[in-house]
Amino acid sequence: KDKNNKNKTLKSFNKSLFTNKIFQEKKFLMKNIHDKTYIFVNCIKSKTSLDYEKLGSNLYVFLKTNKIEQTFIEANTSPLTNVQLEKLLHGAQLKSYDFDIYKTDKSKTVITNLYVVGNKYKKNNLLRNKLNSLLEGIFLTRNLVSEPGNVLHPDEYAKRITKLRKYGLKVTVYDQKKLKKMSMNALLGVGQGSVRGSYLVTIEWNGTKNKSKPLGFVGKGVCFDTGGYSLKPAKFMEDMTYDMAGSATVVGLLKSLALRKAKINAVGVVGLVENMPGANAQRPGDIVKSYSGQTIEVLNT
C-alpha cells in the first residue's frame, strides 16, 4: 500500500499497542492479510524477560481488540531469538486469561491464536515446560480468586486442593474435629459463625532427597470475610471474597513446583474459614487459646 497509508497504520498501531514507555520503535514488518495491513514491531528498549512478556501481552490485546483470530510470527525473518519468542508467547498466554464460566452469553468471545512458524524456531522444551508450569499455577490462583463466595466456600476449597495429589503433591486436610483436638482455637474462632466447616490444609512437594529444611509458604484463606460481628461496610463487602487470595497464591505455587519437577522441598499451609455473623459467631472480647498455648483476646472480629 502507499506510503501515507503505511504511516497511518503505524501511527494507529502504536497508539493501541505500544503505550508503555519501555517500548522504543526499532524496526517493523508489514503483512497484508485480506486487504488489512498489520504490523509486528520489534521495539524492545531493554532486553529483559519481562519486557518481552509485556510485548506479548500488549500484542494479544491488540489482536483481540481487532478481532484477529489467527496470527503468525515468521521466525526466519523475526529479529527475536527463540528464547525471546518463548517469553513473548508466555506474555500473550498470561493476558489471554478470561474467567467466563458463569457468563450466560459466550458467543461474543473471540478466540485469538498466535503461532510461530519457520525452521529457525526450535522449541526450547526445558524453558517451555518451566513457563507452562508457571502458567498453570498462575491460572489456578486466578481461578480460585475469581470464584464467588457461594461457590468456593471452605468445604469446596478443601476438596479442590485434594485434587492436586495427582501431580505428586502430598495433601493433608485437617477438619474441625481434628483442629479441636489440636487446640487450633484461634483459627476455629474465625469460622465458628459459619454453617461451613473450617480447615487447615498442608501441601507438600518433595523434589529432592536432600534432608535440608523445606521452603515454607503460608496463605490466608478467609473465603468470605463479612467482618463477623464487627461488620464491614456494605460498600466494601463484595470484595471480601478476595480475602483468600494469599492461600490461592500458595496453592498455585505448589502446583507449579510439582509440574516442573522442581529440585526442592517445599510445604504450603493454608487455613480455610468463612467469617460470618451468626448465633455461634465469635464476639469482640472473647478469649481463645491458640495452638501455641498463647491466649488471645479478640477485640475486633
PLM feature segments, named:
Residues E86-L94, G191-S194, K232-T241, R283-S290:
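A glycine- and small-aliphatic-rich helix-loop capping segment at beta-alpha/alpha-beta transitions
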